[in-house]
Amino acid sequence: MKKQVLFIALVVAITASLAAAPAAEAADTAKTVKVFLLAGQSNMEGKAPNTLLDYQAEDPKTKDLFKHLRKDGKWIVRDDVFIKFLERKGPLTIGYGSPDRTGAELEFGWMMGDRFDEPVVLIKAAWGGHSLFQQFCSPSRLPEKEKKFQQDMATWEKAHEAALQKGPKIRLRDPGNDRFKPQPYGSSYRAMLAEVKETFDNCETMFPALKGRKLELAGFVWFQGWNDQYGGAEKEYGSNMTHFIKDVRKDLGVPNLPFVIAAMGQNGSTPAAGPMLTIREAQMSMNDVPEFKGNVKAFRTDVLVDKATEEPSPTLVKNGELLKKPAGDGGYHYNGSPIWFTRIGHAMGEAMLELMKGQK
């Protein structure tokens, strides 16, 4: 109950913050800021190593894809697009992914900055390993999940107590180990909303160049799916996604907020199967929900694959040293390919601009 009260208070505070921003139709572009919320798990964090990005930006075979992001051999730092990614913030450039890495936010933010006269702020709320089923579970799904959480917690507490009776040190694989302790449902959803509130409340402190401007929440981008492949969570992904979209719009106070979904596609050129295919189909099915017509757009990411990273046994970037192969991470992270992440960011941007154009 206490958690519920705190969440309601957070939603009220966010709605009040957003209400201070003028509606898009009446916005004075000289005094507003376009804000885009980017959420998901590790791939929304961004997994393309900067060392590999630097290399491909100078390699004659790949440099054309990145030339608009560079000037005089260096990465451009935007003075009209800003980003907040958890504890980090600043003008948009490379490096706003996981440590020493970059994600789809770079190309997406570039496109938004080039399209709008107003400054742009990206709020990135992403945490590796978090599922829509659990951590990103939205409020309208919580009541039915709370019972399961209590059951899981009771089971774990019993196992934990039994393990402690065997000795103070609990084996790593013992079901009573802390790593198996059930996590609260909706924790990342609430943290995501808190990121929005913090940015709206403290924007002028975070980004002094935006002093005196009003923030306008303009769109949402979702890039997630991997952790819903387990425990049968994929079977309810479509329902969970529908609830999530509706709840986000309700809690942020923007009824038809443009919502882009980068559908799961780590399979690349290999046909998707099993839970991965189920999740992708659920994500793509959002295009067919009648009430989402014209305000939700899902697209496939597997068709954007950087095929060079699918070569047998690609060598990774290790210990900061670039071993000149195109893959910078494992398959679950889109091979850590700067090309793949850039293509995904571009597709995100195209989808967002299409939705926004249709709403005018």
Language-model-derived ranges and their functions:
Residues 1-9:
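Bacterial N-terminal signal peptides that target proteins for export
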Residues 8-17:
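Bacterial N-terminal signal peptides
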Residues 19-26:
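Boundary at the C-terminal end of the N-terminal hydrophobic targeting segment
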Residues 26-360:
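Cell-envelope and extracellular/periplasmic
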